[in-house]
Amino acid sequence: KSVHRFGVVYVPNGVIHSAWLPGVEGTSYELSPTLAPLAPFRDRMVVLSGLSCVSPPGRPGGFHAKAATRFLTDVTPPTSETWLDAGISMDQVLATEFGSKTQLASLELAVESNETAGACDIGFACVYSNTIAWKSANTPLPTQNNPRAVFERLFGDSRSTDARARLARIEQDRSILDSVTEETARLRGTLGASDRAKLGEYLESVRDVERRLRLAEEQSDRDVPWMDRPAGIPADYDAHVDLMFDLMLLAYQSDLTRVITFMLGREFSGMTYPQIGVPDAHHPISHH
């Protein structure tokens, strides 16, 4: 049975339009130099142009923070280091729709870490440049750039995608969850009204874990492509990107999630690309 999936790959700091967009409109276009590697998928592609998301009048500056935030929300963020106000992103709208059918509602991937904080773009909080996924107007979803951490989120701390290892992990998690459920049931009778309300919030998260475990048990015999647990973050950029795409594909094939966003870099990226003869940092060189 076919299912709907959604994936986004974000390229920061803009693109060279003359090398990105095809020269003509319609179905007979030739792929541009930047899109040429996608030639094997030419018959399944649609290249869109003419889209824009212009800042409201009186809201100058902060173009990098605005670019990442508006990409999937179409909301211009406020100029503030602490006050977060964006909007639910497109991926999270779909995650709400698809999430009940998978163990993970969504997956947020990146190549760079999101450890920057404070103001990154003329008074705008760094978080606006660090992620494109927003669960709500004030709840940004952090990205994960460590392939090992992504693998463990998908399959637990097993060493591979081997079915027996996955089932053993599920059984261990089920045992822990049963113990937690018994303890909270005993605790509930000793609490006052206020504390019971807090416990209720905690139990909501426990029920979500139960739901994911139930799905994991139902899918434990599913044929999952073999993959060893990654050791960590590859030193080589290309190897890092390839591994993240492999994990993205594995998550889809395993139906562990149907919604994934992937940032190839963050806004204001300082990454360099010596492997292609570009030793300068990404962000400064984008101001060509």
Task: Spell out what each predicted region is.
Residues 1-288:
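Ligand-binding pockets and gating/stacking loops
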